[in-house]
Amino acid sequence: RTFVKKYSASRQFTGEGYLEYRTTSGNIIDSDKDELRVEFSTVQPSGLLFYARNSGGPFADYVALELVGGRLRFSIRYGRSSHSTENLHETLLGKNLNDAKSHSVEILHDKDVTTIYLDKTSDQEKAEHSFKTKYTKLDIDVAMYVGGAFDFKALLSVKSNALFMGCIFQAEFKKILPGPEKVIDFLKDDKVTTYPRTMNQKCVAQTYEPFTFSSDDSSFVCSVGGLSSANSLSGSFVFRTYKPSGVLLKQVDGGNGFELSYMEMDVQLKVIIRNSETLLNINYQNELTKINKGNWHYVTFNISQTSFELSVGSKRETRTPAVTLPSNFFKDGLTAGGFVGCMNELIINKQKCQPNAGSRIKNVEWSGCNITDFCIFSPCLHGGECTQTGKTFSCGCSGTGYDKGPNSLSVCQFSESESTCESLKKNNPSLSLSDRSYALDFDDSGPIRTYKAFCNFSADPPTTRVESRDFKIKLTPSKQPISQRISYEPSLDAAKALARRSEWCYQFVDFGCKKAKLHTGSNNEKLGFWVSSNGVYQSYWGGAKQGSRSCACGETNPNSCIDSSKKCNCDAGLDKWHNDEGYLNSTTLLPVVEVMFKGVTSGTEANFTVGHLYCAGEISNTATFVNEDGFIKLEKWSPPSNGVISLFFKTPYEKGVLLYNGMPEKDFFQVEIINETSVGLSYNIGNGVRKIELSLGDKQVNDRSWHHVMIYHNMKVFGFRLDNQEGKHENPLFLKRELNLNNELYVAGYPYDVSKGFVGCIRGLDVNGEVQDLSKLAGEAVFVKSGCGAACENNSCKNHAKCLDNYNVYFCDCSKTPYYGYFCHEENGASFKDPGSQLVYEYPSASDVFRFDIVVGFKLGEGKPCIGDIIRLGSSDKSQFYRLSLTNRKLQFDFKGPRGQGSITIDPPSVGDFCRDVHTFALSRRYKVVNYTIDGVKKPKEEIERLDGLFTSMKKVTIGKEGDGGFKGCITGVKVTREAVGQKPETVEPIKEYLYDDKNTDLVTSKHVSRATCGPEPKVPEIPTPRPVGQRADVSTPQGITTNPKLQAEDDDKTAIIVVVVLILVLLLVVLILVIYWYWARHKGEYHTHEDDEELKATDPYIEPAAPRKLKGEEPEKKKEWYI
């Protein structure tokens, strides 16, 4: 491949010169509309193509067009700015533009729109980008440069820092508006100065057939005929690299030979004669760029009896040998390689060396120069140090506070610090924390750096402080409004990030005044404002309610301001110092961004204070997605080269899309619940769909507990976390391309199939370190509610049953009640009124259990004594028992446990006793811990040392008791659960199984027991029917609920057909009515009307064009009405 000469005025740039057009005095560019056209060809990856500058210093107008790492970088700023990055716009276009091919650039600036085109008219890959700018005018009053500049340090926003090396075929700037039109042709205009003046006027052909050494041990042997008998060796080549050091060329045999190598700042030729070394060194210490910045370097060298010579570019060094070369010093073959990089035009003693089949090749690519500058726009985040070889890169994260420890895949993405003092305490319970400063990262992996903030752990919950610098700021009287932005340490963005993730915040404000007014002036003009974090002016002050337009004293009842007719002390305008102070406490509005005062005029004095920002708690920001077609839309996930999204979810369902962004046939990512134990990530970055599936093993993800999900990507990996599981693909973006997403980010939904949506709760959604306000967004979406849980808000669960929120329907958990049915309203009771009533259940085998649960309902029989055993658990060897009975109108739990006997007396939950009405009782014993609930009221747990052990040989459940000691009345819904170590819990329901289900009859013996109802059955509504979302966990499907998605799809199809038919019929009916009405209006009965007037008839849309008009004064014909 070669450079091709296209224009007679082409200019060859050698990397040592540039063109300059001075825009001072009469040549100033003041343009609303202009064009810039540049066409170039090069093999160098970096170099300045065009630059225009203004004299406004670091905040002035400029235009920069440059090659950086083989990509085209375009950067502009119109209008002077108070910040170096304000109004700055930049973009990167194309890749591998240093391919020796011709590339064209066209930039069109038309007022507030600037568009850049790359290779617009060529057959190469095209690209374009547009900016919308705040200002419209380009002002250039210093100079325009092509190919470089005298001093790169004086240029704003230039990344290449290198003179262009290659050919420029066209460089033309055209000012269009305001007129007259002006064209500057940099290659022809006599006002353009060339530095140096000897720069070649035409481009020269250059062979470009590079090869790549892809690893440190890459090499090939270059065979040079006649070299072994030669007295000298001379050679030349060009090379480029990003590796800090390496060997370029060598031939060493014993104590003789030479080696040509490089380091960051040096190229070195070492000649060894009889183990004696002579060094020639070309130093780049004072150059703008280092050797390993990826640019091509031209090297020549010569080794002879009379001299050693080394040249790199225009730098040259010569040495005289101290000893003569031996006769057999050179060999026929020498080795090229020993570094990662590229070579081109390797010539040894006028013979061309290329890697070929006979040259003993090792890891050499022949296809071209295939190295990449990864560090020019550093992929290392948070200030990590980027080092590279041209084939890969690594990030040094030491001292950054991110990605602690050595990790070859790290890009310094994940913070080592907690986000708030609250999370620091919660996630480090073993640490001894005192009131002092700690390293915190308010946006986790976001762009805000780690900062040492003060934590007050004496407060509950702990508070985090971001410091303000604005205390007792004196205000200078002015006729104009006085405004001041509030400064925070480390930044306003950090203060906003803290407030966004906190449950509540407060901030002290104070306005001191002498004659100056704060709130209201004459004619009720508002005088004082503060700007909230969302950019809205607020007119209420510290201590007052949000939106009250008042100060603290104006909020009291009665008004406590100095002048009770005013709302602030300072509005009294007195000639003595007063103040209005207090705390602002709106988390959504804090921190204070700016204050503005109009009431500090001549003859007044004032000062103000905006105190530190204090925040506490962690906002949950929870939303409930009640149907699968409910979702929240956010802006697409960006930037394309790295990002982190994390959230918590809980659901009873085993499917549902949690996150989706992109398009199915293009770049996308999707996080989806796959089944009851697994969640998966699938994505495509342009090289096919890849998947990561993580499983919790025996634990379910649809267990109604919170589970954490995180996805992240960077230039090295795409990763996924589920709770404590993690998977990643080392599928680096830099080997393919960036994650270029279209459309919005969908939370809990999939836009291409709404039936795949997630149903459940999501909280703590964090996108690139920014907490999303799901609670607020839920109010703007359909089928989404703020908070967690929606179905249980109006549930009909009876008898103290727990409502289970399945989010689009609720279920009633009857397991801790002695009732059954969907609403826990049905009884399975038995009568124990007879003196001999008793029911005994014996397990098939005895078991040593650490836990048992008892649930029972009971009602004393009419006129029966308020005593007796209700239920008793016993061991097969009679060594232990546990008994619930009525004694002295109270319940008593007696036991003979592993360490002795004891009892607990249980009072009724309210005034009264257990001798009337229906009562429910639930007890759970786990070793020595006992929990119990009476009539739905949970009592404090008790720890009983005599129970600390196993209930050995549990065998028998006895309900009631034969004889006088038994409970006489109605007992219902007995449920007993036992659990042995290493075994699953086992539940038996003796009354239901024996009397109602006719089950386990061989395990039950009973006397004088029959079915009975202990109390009236409550009225309940119809069973709610949910929309199907898939299989539910832990809950049986109630009768009447459809869960077959195929049936639902068929129903949806039928519904759609019916809707279409109905719409067509309605449309036909409307048309028919219009036709009938038109006919009726045209042919009404006999009557006179002004519509027959000549002027009105001319505008009647229903008059036939051929109908003759009546002459003025002629009696109009009467219309007739026909009855058929």
From Swiss-Prot:
Membrane-related topology note: Single-pass membrane protein
Cytoplasmic domain ranges by topology: 1077-1124
Bridged cysteine pairs (disulfide): C167-C203, C342-C369, C375-C386, C380-C395, C397-C412, C761-C788, C792-C803, C797-C812, C814-C824
Localization (cell): Membrane
Taxonomic path: Eukaryota, Metazoa, Cnidaria, Anthozoa, Hexacorallia
Compositional bias annotation for Basic and acidic residues: 1111-1124
Transmembrane residue ranges: 1056-1076
Keyword rRNA-binding: no
Region described as Disordered: 1011-1047, 1090-1124
GO cellular component: membrane
Protein name (record): EGF and laminin G domain-containing protein
Main location: membrane
Extracellular side: 1-1055
Keyword tags: Disulfide bond, EGF-like domain, Membrane, Repeat, Transmembrane, Transmembrane helix
Ranges annotated as biased composition (Polar residues): 1034-1046
Gene3D superfamilies: 2.60.120.1000, 2.60.120.200, Laminin
Stretches assigned to the Laminin G-like domain: 8-203, 210-369, 621-788
Tissues where this protein is expressed: Component of the acid-insoluble organic matrix of the aragonitic skeleton (at protein level).
Domain EGF-like: 371-413, 789-825
Highest taxon of source: Eukaryota
